[in-house]
Structure formats: structure tokens, C-alpha cells
From Swiss-Prot:
Keyword set includes DNA damage: no
Cofactor(s) the protein needs: Mg(2+); thiamine diphosphate
Cofactor binding, note field: Binds 1 Mg(2+) ion per subunit.
Name under which the protein is recorded: 1-deoxy-D-xylulose-5-phosphate synthase
Subunit structure of this chain's protein: Homodimer.
Length: 629
């Protein structure tokens, strides 16, 4: 097992191997414990690629919840789950944190199969409230007695699923606690009317900063708690006036706050009184993303998931690599300068999708809808109906949430919407919840959607140009990772649906596009009889070239960074069958099972789509493959 960098004196944390050990500490010891937890999290995250700022901001509420509740009997749910590092440490996984998100190590999110203390498996936003409601309903139906508490960020609360669940929670009236962790951030800055309402609540200053502020907050809460319990609706000590302007109250959910989310002793005091109230209650806490680490507090967007850094100084080496996200961002920003119809829509992924510069250069043609993928797609449909050329910039794993909108709102009317799909394929350390290995399959099933897989930044630009100048919905998918930068003004002319022969050889031909093409070229580089085709379009296929290679080669190998179920390989087999061509075909792709976290290269090897795996298949097909020493 790996060791954490640096050393630290953690006398309190050393005593804790589970929640029961935490309860043995006095309340007066809790602030010191939270400082030790923050130091531990900083050391864990200093290796890079982990969720630092959000985890630091949630330390106090996680500590308070475990101090008051009885996990795993009581169920504590975390929305998204990336902020739950303190939860993992306090529930007996401290010695596994050095290997978090590594192959064979623990997940970076909560995961039911990992620990009895992880109430849900999660990675996507806005799911916790519906899960919590289901648990509360099941508890009551089974005649059991335990608490259900869900921790959700203000960013996740912008998601329609969370708001819809909140509406049902208020209607059902079951006992449960919702902790609204308000740090004004998701990954990018939060947007939308709900975010503005949350800021309005903070402005009212129902808690004060400075010495003695916590006591004042507690005193302010006492009367409203009594009012809530007696259902007096017109108390002069209500937190808001009138109550009807508060959407939580309007939904039938008791609201308390906002309170200081970094005073662990006062959070304990509050939780002890709130968890036993009948009906649903929201505790609104205000936190600072990156709390306790000055450089993370100053730049929470970068420190959300930083590269490797020195925990003492915050110094890090900026990456000089050119990412696919940057390639897309530069291309669409440049293209929009020449076409006033181009309008970019994204669901809370400005930084991740490479759109910071676009949002600055074209602020009136940029829309961040928050964590609301369905809204992003249908808003783009509305734009297209009015003659715009919207581009939806979205991660593959999140496009899954808007399948119906792509089908119903875009494809049926063959609208001019371009989907630029980042993080397509295996993403690596974030694991099963974030791998983008289904988009080829579900988009293939929608009539009229054309799908491209660029091999590099130049092809991405060519596909974007084609999509923005031709009618109908287009999908351009590209992986997480890096590509070669191309000069501004590079706009190659591509014909959609036309493949490219990259290596001669007619005995066995490998068909691959995107990331998989790199593996195919490497596998075949020293094999003269093995051809390689850049199958950069999955829909439509290049039937002319497929007929040619399918008629000559004795075997074809399709390779894709997508599930084998309904993917590129299936499309090739369907086409060959319709042509009455029957060469041997081997379909390589992601197996029909969820892939756990590891590096993308490791998962590709495990799935059998990397260069050595392709060479093994070539040998099985009778190709003379030199033995590698």
C-alpha cells in the first residue's frame, strides 16, 4: 500500500477507526479533529487528480453528522459523492486513502459495495434527494426506525431531478433531513434563479461572523424550531418574511438557516434537535470551498481537482499538454467569430469543456444552464427552431441523462444542433459512473443523428465546420486526454461519412476511429498484410469503403472505445450482412459490464482493445505477429 506524502501529528484522528470512536471524543475536541481531517485530505490530494476543495469544505458537516447519527443504521447520503473524503476517513478507510481512485483502491465517490457506511453509489449530481425519499418511504413501510440524511450542494440543487424530488418530499411529508451545503460552486460557478435565491438568503445575514457568532445563530434558531414544531405559521421570529417567498416552505419542507457550516460544535447542537422533527427539514449551511487552505479558498475552481502539488506551499507545475477540451474550445470560439448563428450551451461545464474563452469572447452567445442536461438539449432545440446553430458542449456520461430530449426535441424534427461530446470512452480514475462508453450505442439508435470520431484536433475542426454548415443533428465525440495543437484557421474539408485509408494491407483490415485508432496503428505498424482504416464516421458508415475492404480481406477487426453492445462493431456487422459479405469479423470494445476505476490505459488493456490485445487477435487470425521480447 502506498504511503501519504509528508507527516502530520494527528492524535485525535489516530483514535478513530469508525463512527463509534468519533463519538468518544468530547464536543470540545471536534474543532481540533476537523483540522486534522483537513490536513489529512490535503496530503491525500497532493498527488493530483482528486477532489480537494469540495472535500475540505464539507469536513465540518460530515464530522457533525457522524457524531450525531449512528451510521450505518442511520443512512447518510452524499450527492455526487466527490466531497465525501472525510466520510471515508471517519468510517474506517483512512489507511486506504493513499490508493483512492487507483486500480484496486477505493472509489473517489461513495459506493455501496465498498462500505456499509456508503448509502448510495453515486457520481452524477442531483440524485441524493430521490434516493433519500425512497429510503424514508421504505423505512416507514417496513415499520423501521432510523434517520435518513442527505447532503446536497447548491450546485446539485439546480438539477431538475433534485427539485422534482424536493417537491415530492414536501408532498409526502416523511421524516428526513436535507443538509444544503451552500458553497456557491459546483465545478464552475453556479447559475440560475435558484442560485440567486440562495444568495439572497445569505445577504439577510441570519448568522454573523466573528467571536460569539455561533451562539447568536443557535439562539436565533431556538424560537423558529419551536414554531416549526407547533406549526405556527406567523411567528415574528421566522427566518424569512413572508414564508411564502421561500420555495422550500412553499413545497412543504421546513427550512432552517442559513448557518455557519464551519462551526462543528454548533452544527452538532443543531443536528441533535433537527433529526427528530417530524416531516422533512432542510438545514441550510454556508461553507467555503477549499476551507482551511488559503490557496484553495482563493481559487476553488482550479483546486476543485488540482494536479500534483506541494501541500505546504500549493506550488504545482502547470500542464503544458494540449487537451481535446482545449482543442474544441479554441475551434468553436474561432468559428463563432465568422458565424453569428453559433450559440454554445453547456450544463455546468464551462471549465471542463474548454469554454472559458468562448464565454468571454461571445458572452451573449453562451449559456450555462447549470446541472440540467435535459434543459441544455431542449433549449438548444428551441434555438435551432429560430434559425440558430447551437452547439451543446457536454460530457458523454452526462449526455445519457438527456437521451429523450435528443430524440424527442431534436431528432424528430431533424434540427440543426451539434453535440460536442467530451470525455467519450474510458475516462479512467473516476470509474463506472463517469466512463463515456454508451453514447455511440444510444445515439446510433436515434434516426437522423450523424456521429463522428475525430482522430485529432484538425479532424475535430473539420467535423465542426461540416456540422455547422449542413442540416440536421450531429454528434462529435472525443476522449479525455491530449492531442496535437493545430494552427488557428485550420478548417479541413471533410465529407461526412467518408473514411480514410491510413495503412495498406488487404489480408486483415482494422477499422477504428478516435482513440481506438491510435491502438490500431500501433498494433499494425510492422505487419505488411494488415491494413488500417480511419473509420471516423460511425453514422453513416462509409459503405463504399466497407464494401471494398469487406470484399477483399479475409478478416476484419473493429475496435472501439465504447460498449460492444450496439456500437460501431455491431453497425459494421449489420452493414456487411446487408451487402451479403461475410468475412470473419472480430469486434473489440468495452465488454458488457461496468468498468471500475483505473487508468484509461489499464482499462483498455483489461478490455482487450489496446495494441497488444489487437496483436493477440491478429495472431489468432493467422497473421504472423513477431514475438515481442
Amino acid at each position: 500500500m502506498n504511503e501519504l506524502p509528508g507527516t502530520s501529528d494527528t492524535p485525535l484522528l489516530d483514535q478513530i477507526h469508525g463512527p463509534k470512536d468519533l463519538k468518544r471524543l468530547s464536543r470540545e475536541q471536534l474543532p481540533a479533529l476537523t483540522e486534522e481531517l483537513r490536513g489529512e485530505i490535503v496530503r491525500v490530494c497532493s498527488r493530483g487528480g482528486l477532489h480537494l476543495a469540495s472535500s475540505l469544505g464539507a469536513v465540518d458537516i460530515i464530522t457533525a453528522l457522524h457524531y450525531v447519527l449512528d451510521s450505518p443504521r442511520d443512512r447518510i447520503l452524499f450527492d455526487v459523492g466527490h466531497q465525501a473524503y472525510a466520510h471515508k476517513i471517519l468510517t474506517g478507510r483512512r489507511d486506504q486513502m493513499a490508493d483512492i481512485k487507483k486500480e484496486g483502491g477505493i472509489s473517489g465517490f461513495t459506493k455501496v459495495s465498498e462500505s456499509e457506511h456508503d448509502a448510495i453509489t453515486v457520481g452524477h449530481a442531483s440524485t441524493s434527494l430521490a434516493n433519500a425519499l425512497g429510503m424514508a418511504l421504505a423505512r416507514d413501510a417496513q415499520g423501521k426506525d432510523f434517520h435518513v440524511a442527505a447532503v446536497i450542494g447548491d450546485g446539485s440543487l439546480t438539477g431538475g431531478m433534485a427539485l422534482a424530488a424536493l417537491n415530492t418530499i414536501g408532498d409526502m411529508g416523511r421524516k428526513m433531513l436535507i443538509v444544503l451545503n451552500d458553497n456557491e460552486m459546483s465545478i464552475s460557478e453556479n447559475v440560475g434563479a435558484m442560485n440567486k435565491f440562495m444568495r439572497g438568503l445569505q445577504v439577510q445575514k441570519w448568522f454573523q461572523e466573528g467571536e460569539g457568532a455561533g451562539k447568536k445563530a443557535v439562539e436565533a434558531v431556538s424560537k423558529p424550531l419551536a414554531d416549526f414544531m407547533s406549526r405556527a405559521k406567523n411567528s415574528t421570529r421566522h427566518f424569512f418574511d413572508p414564508a411564502s417567498v421561500n420555495p422550500f416552505a412553499a413545497m412543504g419542507v421546513r427550512y432552517v438557516g442559513p448557518v455557519d457550516g464551519h462551526n462543528v460544535q454548533e452544527l452538532v447542537w443543531l443536528l441533535e434537535r433537527l433529526v427528530d422533527l417530524d416531516g422533512p427539514t432542510i438545514l441550510h449551511i454556508v461553507t467555503t470551498k477549499g476551507k482551511g487552505l488559503s490557496y484553495a479558498e482563493a481559487d476553488p475552481i482550479y483546486w476543485h481537482g488540482p494536479a500534483k502539488f506541494d501541500p505546504a506551499t500549493g506550488e504545482y507545475v502547470p500542464s503544458s499538454a494540449y487537451s481535446w477540451s482545449a482543442a474544441f474550445g479554441e475551434a468553436v470560439t474561432e468559428w463563432a467569430k465568422t458565424d453569428p448563428r453559433t450559440f454554445v450551451v453547456t450544463p455546468a461545464m464551462r471549465e471542463g469543456s474548454g469554454l472559458v474563452e468562448f464565454s468571454r469572447v461571445h458572452p451573449h452567445r453562451y449559456l450555462d444552464v447549470g446541472i440540467a442536461e435535459e434543459v441544455a438539449v431542449t433549449t438548444a432545440a428551441g434555438m435551432a427552431l429560430q434559425g440558430m446553430r447551437p452547439v451543446v458542449a457536454i460530457y458523454s456520461t452526462f449526455l445519457q441523462r438527456a437521451y429523450d430530449q435528443v430524440l424527442h426535441d431534436v431528432a424528430i424534427e431533424h434540427l440543426n444542433v451539434t453535440f460536442c461530446i467530451d470525455r467519450a470512452g474510458i475516462v479512467g480514475a473516476d470509474g463506472a459512473t463517469h466512463n463515456g462508453v454508451f453514447d455511440l450505442s444510444f445515439l446510433r439508435s436515434i434516426p437522423g443523428v450523424r456521429i463522428g470520431l475525430p482522430k485529432d484536433a484538425a479532424e475535430l475542426r473539420g467535423m465542426l465546420k461540416y456540422a455547422q454548415t449542413h442540416d440536421g443533428p450531429f454528434a462529435i465525440r472525443y476522449p479525455r486526454g491530449n492531442t496535437a495543437q493545430v494552427p488557428a484557421g485550420t478548417w479541413p474539408d471533410l465529407k461526412w461519412g467518408e473514411w480514410e485509408r491510413l495503412k495498406g494491407g488487404d489480408d486483415v483490415v482494422i477499422l477504428a476511429g478516435g482513440k481506438a485508432l491510435d491502438y490500431a496503428l500501433k498494433a499494425a505498424e510492422d505487419l505488411p498484410g494488415v491494413g488500417v482504416v480511419n473509420a471516423r464516421f460511425v453514422k453513416p458508415l462509409d459503405e463504399e469503403m466497407l464494401r471494398e475492404v469487406g470484399g477483399r480481406a479475409r478478416a476484419l477487426i473493429t475496435v472501439e472505445d465504447n460498449t460492444v453492445v450496439g456500437g460501431f462493431g455491431g453497425a459494421v456487422l449489420e452493414a456487411l450482412n446487408s451487402m451479403n459479405l461475410h468475412p470473419t469479423v472480430r469486434v473489440l470494445g468495452i465488454p458488457d459490464e461496468f468498468q471500475e476505476h483505473a487508468t484509461a490505459e489499464s482499462v483498455h488493456a483489461r478490455a482487450g482493445i489496446d495494441a497488444p490485445a489487437i496483436r493477440t487477435v491478429l495472431a489468432e487470425l493467422g497473421v504472423d505477429v513477431p514475438i515481442e521480447v
